[in-house]
């Protein structure tokens, strides 16, 4: 491809060489460079791509995209831009033929509820006959074909490659979980969203964003790029988003939803039980919906999805069908149901204070005897939420078993000490080994008890200091039942 074509839509300066030169591929990782590639020198938080220019040239890079002043002796084309992250996004889109413009893209942001919402919308669109792609935490999907996900939102190059694969496969809609990292790091730069949904905002990722204001502003970027913004007005930050959209002159149509406050679309006559909820919403007339996942927070997730589908003119019967039939891996997932155990086991991805409170409150409401929770906190992540999660776990559970999650580079016991140090409860026990913690919960469970294993959900691995091991909690439960 001609370099000039890749640079379309960018403000740039040719420092050296020729913009009519040919480029084989675009790379932002110097380890992947091949002969004739363009190397985009992305400035990261730990490493700076500009430091690897010499290595990139040795491997065959013929073009450098930089934002710093650089000098090289070789016959290399150098293009200077203001921001190489934004440049990577635009160039990647151009390289793959701008597939984003051939898809209707729906973005979902918020601390919790992104995955559930994405799966609900995908289910609704597929019931309506649309081939749908999904990009998210659990995996990426091209229709029914599953592609493993490395991060919630891929880097811009991989994202546009995925868009191209979707377009080639006949996908019409793409539903995306849009993380605060991806918005802040410009992975989704240049993408215009058909619909942007806000689920909620609670403390998370402050190890990255540093302040809550930064976290909020990162999330807000989605609505600056959405044709239609759908906002949860019951969340304390929902009203802020609506206000900021107006005050900042953002060109987006706004719809609000709620259970408590007055909004454009309010759920009422709610009936909740252990298998899900039924509720009504006044759209063009009063409509009744049901979802087979319990918890008030899943009614909120459903509302955003219903409005999204309604805006897209999806037939009402297909919206209802997609909502009632949706299955979400690792979200309030009942495990070993066919074993007819005297107690129940639920696996859930809850890994934030708000997420843990939601799942435990929901399960507690339908637990006949005791609720036993098993949870920990991730290493190399925001430490402030550790005692918060300990307090929530002990307050809501009859017995809390505090264990390891993904400790990463930290010592598991150091993380556990952060969780339990301020606790003034006597209903918790510590078991560092996560499998043994699950075994302990199952061994102590009595008839009518419910065990909630929180934190990993769909994940099939555990990240330790020196290695990542296979760890699927469904398999662990069955292994324990078989005496392993």
From Swiss-Prot:
Pathway entry: Cell wall biogenesis; peptidoglycan biosynthesis
Classification via Pfam families: Mur_ligase, Mur_ligase_C, Mur_ligase_M
Motif (Meso-diaminopimelate recognition motif): 405-408
Gene Ontology MF terms: ATP binding; magnesium ion binding; tetrahydrofolylpolyglutamate synthase activity; UDP-N-acetylmuramoylalanyl-D-glutamate-2,6-diaminopimelate ligase activity
Binding of meso-2,6-diaminopimelate, residues: 381, 405-408, 455, 459
GO CC list: cytoplasm
Domain of life: Bacteria
Binding site for UDP-N-acetyl-alpha-D-muramoyl-L-alanyl-D-glutamate: 152-153, 179, 187
Gene3D superfamilies according to UniProt: Mur ligase, C-terminal domain (3.90.190.20), Mur-like, catalytic domain (3.40.1190.10), MurE/MurF, N-terminal domain (3.40.1390.10)
SUPFAM superfamilies per UniProt: MurD-like peptide ligases, catalytic domain, MurD-like peptide ligases, peptide-binding domain, MurE/MurF N-terminal domain
Residues with N6-carboxylysine modification: 219
Compartments in which it is found: Cytoplasm
Gene Ontology annotations of biological process type: cell division; cell wall organization; peptidoglycan biosynthetic process; regulation of cell shape
Enzymatic reactions: UDP-N-acetyl-alpha-D-muramoyl-L-alanyl-D-glutamate + meso-2,6-diaminopimelate + ATP = UDP-N-acetyl-alpha-D-muramoyl-L-alanyl-gamma-D-glutamyl-meso-2,6-diaminopimelate + ADP + phosphate + H(+)
Cofactor(s) required, per the database record: Mg(2+)
Record key words, sorted: ATP-binding, Cell cycle, Cell division, Cell shape, Cell wall biogenesis/degradation, Cytoplasm, Ligase, Magnesium, Nucleotide-binding, Peptidoglycan synthesis
Enzyme class: ligase
Binding site for ATP: 110-116
Record PTM text: Carboxylation is probably crucial for Mg(2+) binding and, consequently, for the gamma-phosphate positioning of ATP.
EC number(s) from the headed UniProt entry: 6.3.2.13
InterPro entries for the chain: Folylpolyglutamate_synth_CS, Mur-like_cat_sf, Mur_ligase_C, Mur_ligase_C_dom_sf, Mur_ligase_cen, Mur_ligase_N, MurE/MurF_N, UDP-N-AcMur-Glu-dNH2Pim_ligase
Function per UniProt: Catalyzes the addition of meso-diaminopimelic acid to the nucleotide precursor UDP-N-acetylmuramoyl-L-alanyl-D-glutamate (UMAG) in the biosynthesis of bacterial cell-wall peptidoglycan.
HAMAP family: MurE
Similarity comment: Belongs to the MurCDEF family. MurE subfamily.
Official protein name in the record: UDP-N-acetylmuramoyl-L-alanyl-D-glutamate--2,6-diaminopimelate ligase
Organism of provenance: Clostridium perfringens (strain 13 / Type A)
Lineage: Bacteria, Bacillati, Bacillota, Clostridia, Eubacteriales
């Amino acid at each position: 491809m001609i370099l000039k074509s890749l640079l379309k839509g960018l403000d740039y300066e040719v420092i050296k060489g020729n913009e009519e030169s040919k480029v084989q591929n675009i790379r932002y990782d110097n380890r992947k460079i091949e002969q004739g590639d363009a190397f985009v020198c992305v400035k990261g938080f730990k490493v700076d791509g500009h430091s690897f220019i010499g290595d990139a040239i040795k491997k065959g890079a013929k073009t450098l995209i930089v934002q710093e002043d650089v000098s090289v002796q070789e016959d290399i084309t150098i293009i200077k831009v203001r921001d190489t992250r934004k440049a990577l996004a635009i160039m990647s889109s151009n390289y793959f033929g701008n597939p984003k413009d051939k898809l209707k893209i729906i973005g979902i942001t918020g601390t919790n509820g992104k995955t559930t919402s994405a799966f609900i919308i995908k289910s609704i669109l597929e019931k309506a006959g649309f081939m749908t792609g999904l990009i998210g935490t659990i995996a990426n999907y091209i229709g029914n074909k599953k592609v493993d996900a490395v991060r919630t939102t891929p880097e811009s190059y991989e994202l546009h490659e995925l868009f191209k694969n979707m377009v080639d496969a006949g996908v019409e809609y793409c539903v995306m979980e849009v993380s605060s990292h991806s918005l802040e790091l410009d992975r989704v730069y240049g993408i215009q969203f058909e619909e942007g949904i806000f689920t909620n905002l609670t403390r998370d990722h402050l190890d990255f964003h540093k302040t809550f204001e930064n976290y909020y502003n990162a999330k807000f970027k989605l609505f600056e790029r959405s044709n239609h913004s759908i906002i949860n007005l019951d969340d304390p930050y929902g009203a802020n988003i609506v206000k900021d959209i107006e005050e900042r002159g953002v060109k987006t149509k706004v719809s609000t939803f709620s259970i408590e406050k007055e909004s454009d679309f309010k759920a009422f006559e709610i009936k909740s039980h252990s298998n899900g909820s039924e509720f009504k919403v006044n759209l063009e007339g009063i409509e009744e919906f049901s979802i087979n996942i319990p918890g008030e927070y899943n009614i909120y997730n459903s509302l955003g999805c219903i409005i999204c589908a309604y805006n897209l003119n999806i037939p009402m019967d297909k919206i209802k069908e997609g909502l009632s039939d949706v299955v979400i891996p690792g979200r309030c997932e009942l495990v070993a149901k066919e074993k007819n155990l005297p107690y129940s086991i639920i696996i859930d991805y809850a890994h934030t204070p708000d997420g843990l409170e939601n799942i435990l409150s929901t399960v507690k409401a339908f637990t006949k005897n005791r609720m036993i929770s098993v949870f920990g906190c991730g290493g190399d992540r925001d430490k402030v939420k550790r005692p918060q999660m300990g307090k929530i776990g002990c307050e809501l559970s009859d017995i809390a078993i505090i264990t390891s999650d993904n400790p990463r580079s930290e010592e598991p016991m150091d993380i556990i000490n952060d969780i339990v140090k301020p606790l003034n409860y006597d209903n918790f026990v510590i078991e560092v080994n996560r499998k043994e913690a699950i075994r302990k919960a199952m061994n102590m469970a009595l008839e009518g008890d419910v065990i909630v294993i929180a934190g990993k959900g769909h994940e099939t691995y555990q990240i330790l200091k020196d290695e990542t091991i296979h760890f699927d909690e469904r398999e662990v439960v069955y292994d324990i039942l078989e005496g392993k």
